[in-house]
């Protein structure tokens, strides 16, 4: 394997987890945060095909066939989204 010939990793390896952790309190919170946003992005693409627009689309440029979770991680790393706890999050586990 020659160095410099491999493509730059994307998705879960890019952005690095250490960079993403600067935007969340824990890995668990980061996973929930990214999953919720990925679900919104996925719904946006589904609604786009149906002519409905109830969710906000990707806030960063994306490539065709890019996974919603990868897009969500890049949005979080870019500082375009801010994690806030909802009332359900505060009462969970009590």
Swiss-Prot record:
Reactions this protein catalyses: RNA(n) + a ribonucleoside 5'-triphosphate = RNA(n+1) + diphosphate
Cited SUPFAM superfamilies: RPB6/omega subunit-like
E.C. number: 2.7.7.6
Superkingdom in the source lineage: Bacteria
Any single Gene Ontology cellular-component annotation: DNA-directed RNA polymerase complex
GO biological process, one term: DNA-templated transcription
Keywords attached to this entry: DNA-directed RNA polymerase, Nucleotidyltransferase, Transcription, Transferase
HAMAP family referenced in this protein's UniProt entry, alphabetically: RNApol_bact_RpoZ
Complex and partners: The RNAP catalytic core consists of 2 alpha, 1 beta, 1 beta' and 1 omega subunit. When a sigma factor is associated with the core the holoenzyme is formed, which can initiate transcription.
Family, as annotated: Belongs to the RNA polymerase subunit omega family.
UniProt name for this protein: DNA-directed RNA polymerase subunit omega
Species of the source: Bifidobacterium adolescentis (strain ATCC 15703 / DSM 20083 / NCTC 11814 / E194a)
Gene behind the chain: rpoZ
